[in-house]
């Protein structure tokens, strides 16, 4: 029994580095593929967005002198590399995948549209959405919110390197405590940085819940999908 029928899984590019300082750790990729395969076996339809921060981040590039638009486009290409890597890892363990791109680049990936994406999900494909929104000045978190809303996901699962949302940065403040559940209004009131404001506002306005959890611990994705109390659940209601 699963808590969700269809989810949008957001993975950070940095998490793909594993213990490395750059690029893609094959062991981390294999762990992700194993968990996602088990999730598919549970009957959950899974759409995925991966960041590109392990390869290139547009904002950082702009700070170093790159034109911001070109920097963001480089970041979009980084998400394509990560998407292809995850697609390859999943197909290697017998999971059907499709990479859809927000910018035309056939045959690397198929051009995204909502109806085709939903059709693929219903056919059992893990559908990986790359290039963010396809526009500069938008983060991959915003791309995740957009895709989650478009594919009519039950929730967005934000897989990170931390195990939820805290009152403060737990790495800097040892007294920080974790929320098991929090509303979007409280996130704004407390000034918590879960995602950028655009991404958070989109989820709030379209009533898309978020579960923030530690994806780097094998098995956690399956626990979230079973409805176990891990991570932090974010929604418009407190109960």
Curated annotation (Swiss-Prot):
<dbReference type="InterPro" id="IPR011817">
    <property type="entry name" value="Uridylate_kinase"/>
</dbReference>
<feature type="binding site">
    <location>
        <begin position="10"/>
        <end position="13"/>
    </location>
    <ligand>
        <name>ATP</name>
    </ligand>
</feature>
<feature type="binding site">
    <location>
        <position position="169"/>
    </location>
    <ligand>
        <name>ATP</name>
    </ligand>
</feature>
<feature type="binding site">
    <location>
        <position position="72"/>
    </location>
    <ligand>
        <name>UMP</name>
    </ligand>
</feature>
<feature type="binding site">
    <location>
        <begin position="133"/>
        <end position="140"/>
    </location>
    <ligand>
        <name>UMP</name>
    </ligand>
</feature>
<dbReference type="GO" id="GO:0044210">
    <property type="term" value="P:'de novo' CTP biosynthetic process"/>
</dbReference>
<keyword id="KW-0963">Cytoplasm</keyword>
<dbReference type="GO" id="GO:0033862">
    <property type="term" value="F:UMP kinase activity"/>
</dbReference>
<keyword id="KW-0067">ATP-binding</keyword>
<comment type="subunit">
    <text>Homohexamer.</text>
</comment>
<comment type="similarity">
    <text>Belongs to the UMP kinase family.</text>
</comment>
<keyword id="KW-0418">Kinase</keyword>
<feature type="binding site">
    <location>
        <position position="166"/>
    </location>
    <ligand>
        <name>ATP</name>
    </ligand>
</feature>
<comment type="function">
    <text>Catalyzes the reversible phosphorylation of UMP to UDP.</text>
</comment>
<feature type="binding site">
    <location>
        <position position="53"/>
    </location>
    <ligand>
        <name>ATP</name>
    </ligand>
</feature>
<protein>
    <recommendedName>
        <fullName>Uridylate kinase</fullName>
        <ecNumber>2.7.4.22</ecNumber>
    </recommendedName>
</protein>
<dbReference type="InterPro" id="IPR015963">
    <property type="entry name" value="Uridylate_kinase_bac"/>
</dbReference>
<keyword id="KW-0547">Nucleotide-binding</keyword>
<comment type="pathway">
    <text>Pyrimidine metabolism; CTP biosynthesis via de novo pathway; UDP from UMP (UMPK route): step 1/1.</text>
</comment>
<dbReference type="InterPro" id="IPR001048">
    <property type="entry name" value="Asp/Glu/Uridylate_kinase"/>
</dbReference>
<keyword id="KW-0665">Pyrimidine biosynthesis</keyword>
<feature type="binding site">
    <location>
        <position position="160"/>
    </location>
    <ligand>
        <name>ATP</name>
    </ligand>
</feature>
<dbReference type="GO" id="GO:0005737">
    <property type="term" value="C:cytoplasm"/>
</dbReference>
<feature type="binding site">
    <location>
        <position position="57"/>
    </location>
    <ligand>
        <name>ATP</name>
    </ligand>
</feature>
<dbReference type="GO" id="GO:0005524">
    <property type="term" value="F:ATP binding"/>
</dbReference>
<keyword id="KW-0808">Transferase</keyword>
<dbReference type="Pfam" id="PF00696">
    <property type="entry name" value="AA_kinase"/>
</dbReference>
<feature type="binding site">
    <location>
        <position position="52"/>
    </location>
    <ligand>
        <name>UMP</name>
    </ligand>
</feature>
<dbReference type="GO" id="GO:0006225">
    <property type="term" value="P:UDP biosynthetic process"/>
</dbReference>
<dbReference type="InterPro" id="IPR036393">
    <property type="entry name" value="AceGlu_kinase-like_sf"/>
</dbReference>
């Amino acid at each position: 029994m699963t808590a969700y029928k269809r989810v949008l899984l957001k993975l950070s590019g940095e998490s793909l580095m594993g213990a490395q300082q750059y690029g893609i750790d094959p062991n981390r990729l294999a762990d992700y593929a194993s968990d996602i395969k088990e999730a598919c076996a549970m009957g959950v339809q899974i759409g995925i967005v991966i960041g590109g921060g392990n390869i290139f981040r547009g904002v950082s590039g702009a700070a170093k002198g790159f034109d911001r638009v070109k920097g963001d486009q480089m970041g979009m290409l980084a998400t394509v590399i990560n998407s292809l890597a995850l697609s390859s890892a999943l197909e290697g363990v017998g999971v059907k995948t499709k990479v859809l791109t927000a910018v035309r680049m056939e045959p690397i990936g198929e051009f995204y549209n909502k109806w085709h994406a939903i059709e693929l999900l219903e056919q059992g494909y893990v559908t990986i959405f790359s290039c963010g929104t396809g526009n500069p000045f938008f983060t991959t978190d915003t791309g995740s919110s957009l895709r989650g809303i478009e594919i009519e996901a039950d929730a967005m699962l934000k897989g990170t390197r931390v195990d939820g949302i805290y009152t403060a940065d737990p790495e800097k403040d040892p007294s920080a405590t974790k929320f098991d559940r929090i509303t979007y209004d409280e996130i704004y009131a407390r000034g918590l940085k879960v995602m950028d404001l655009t991404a958070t506002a989109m989820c709030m306005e379209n009533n898309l819940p978020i579960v923030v959890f530690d994806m780097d611990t094998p098995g956690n994705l399956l626990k979230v999908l079973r409805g176990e109390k891990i991570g932090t659940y974010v929604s418009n209601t407190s109960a």
